[in-house]
Amino acid sequence: MIARDDVTGLILAGGRGSRMGGTDKGLQPLHGTPMAMHTMMRLTPQVGGLMINANRNLAAYESFGVPVYTDSVPDFAGPLAGMLAGLEQCATPWMVTAPCDSPFLPTDLVARLAQAIEAEGAELAIPVTLDPDGRRQTQPVFCLMPVSALDSLVAYLSGGGRKIETWAASHRLAEVLFDDAAAFANINTLDELRAHEAR
């Protein structure tokens, strides 16, 4: 059984925020609270500890009271670089990731991913949702993985790989269907942020 205390949560806040005009998405306020803090509050009850991957505004993220780690590979290499930084620092057997702009993530995310890993004998687990037309959409940036996946991730990144889906598919992968696609909504633009503020 994968216990809560065996899992560390990693909030991915290391991107450029290019779709948000270069602003740091995780620090943008939603109802007066930074988006990364919303994500942190949703994830905290599900894990034994938390850390943040960020590459700028480090003092602001450190003020959240959890460890902050920068990418160990250069040039904003994407979320996999953040996952690598987390795996390098993770002190528990398991790590779960979530992007900083996912303030509505499910409160049973970790439990359901862990159950699927155990039931299916999988190595990694990611959520799957259905779009309005019933098409499956994987949500690979939300991923429960063992720390032992570090070596395969190093090898994949060293070979120039950057796609989470491709790396994840090279493992025994459990895909877990979640009914509420909106729970995985990313807020990528300032317009989207304003729309959520108005709700």
From Swiss-Prot:
It comes from the Bacteria. Belongs to the MobA family. It is found in: Cytoplasm. It catalyses: Mo-molybdopterin + GTP + H(+) = Mo-molybdopterin guanine dinucleotide + diphosphate. Transfers a GMP moiety from GTP to Mo-molybdopterin (Mo-MPT) cofactor (Moco or molybdenum cofactor) to form Mo-molybdopterin guanine dinucleotide (Mo-MGD) cofactor. GO terms for cellular component: cytoplasm. The N-terminal domain determines nucleotide recognition and specific binding, while the C-terminal domain determines the specific binding to the target protein. PANTHER family: MOLYBDENUM COFACTOR GUANYLYLTRANSFERASE. Mg(2+) binds at residue 101. Monomer. It comes from Cupriavidus taiwanensis (strain DSM 17343 / BCRC 17206 / CCUG 44338 / CIP 107171 / LMG 19424 / R1). NCBIfam families: molyb_mobA (TIGR02665). Keywords: Cytoplasm, GTP-binding, Magnesium, Metal-binding, Molybdenum cofactor biosynthesis, Nucleotide-binding, Transferase. GTP binds at residues 12-14, 25, 53, 71, 101. One of its GO terms (biological process) is bis(molybdopterin guanine dinucleotide)molybdenum biosynthetic process. HAMAP family: MobA. Its cofactor is Mg(2+). Its EC number is 2.7.7.77. The gene is mobA. Its main location: cytoplasm. One of its GO terms (molecular function) is molybdenum cofactor guanylyltransferase activity. This is Molybdenum cofactor guanylyltransferase.
